[in-house]
Amino acid sequence: MRHGLLALICWLYCVVAHSEMLNVEQSGLFRVWFVRIAQEQLRQGPSPRWYQQDCAGLVRFAANEALKVHDSKWLKSNGLSNQYLPPEMTLTPEQRQLAQNWNQGNGKTGPYVTAINLIQYNSQFIGQDINQALPGDMIFFDQGDAQHLMVWMGRYIIYHTGSATKTDNGMRAVSLQQLMTWKDTRWIPNDSNPNFIGIYRLNFLAR
């Protein structure tokens, strides 16, 4: 009886979790919105509504904003016009909250998650071949004392350095060619670099 109850609970959990995932069409639109929002942080500078500005913070912010309703109020608050925008996504209320309920480990969820926990508990490993990356996927490096995320934008890579000054907002954009020839080899995304762990994709996206 007990085993049957546990199996039922696990089945219900899987059904609920699966129902909150984005389907293929939703995932494609999410990626376009995610990339656009990340691009705006580079073009305009970080939004004042983006708290905890670091590499993982960029992913959290872009994901959360991508899942919102992009009405006129949202456009104004993000400094965007209604021209050249991606199609709007049709999402359930639960799906719109996906980036507010990150798995933080130890059975906890919330709007904040570190880079390592974003990878460990909220993403799936894709591989170490950059050609496998889709726009919005994360490029993950582990330097021992610190972990770092970069975002594949489709044609280039962006990231936040984790620090900012009055003259430097911390946002960076580099081409894949630049990264592959980086003088500091710890940041080269190929399998010969032990610090490069791989390409990761958010769990709620369809593969």
Question: Can you name each region flagged by the protein language model?
Answer:
Residues M1-G4:
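Positively charged n-region of N-terminal signal peptides that target proteins for export
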Residues L12-V15:
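N-terminal signal peptide c-region/cleavage motif recognized by signal peptidases
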Residues A17-V113:
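N-terminal capping segments
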Residues G57-F61, L149-W152, I157-H160, A173-Q177:
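Active-site scaffold segments
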Residues S81-T167:
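...with weaker cross-activation on analogous glycine-rich loops/strands in unrelated enzymes
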Residues T161-S163, G170-R207:
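Low-complexity, Gly/Ser/Thr/Pro-rich intrinsically disordered linker/tail segments
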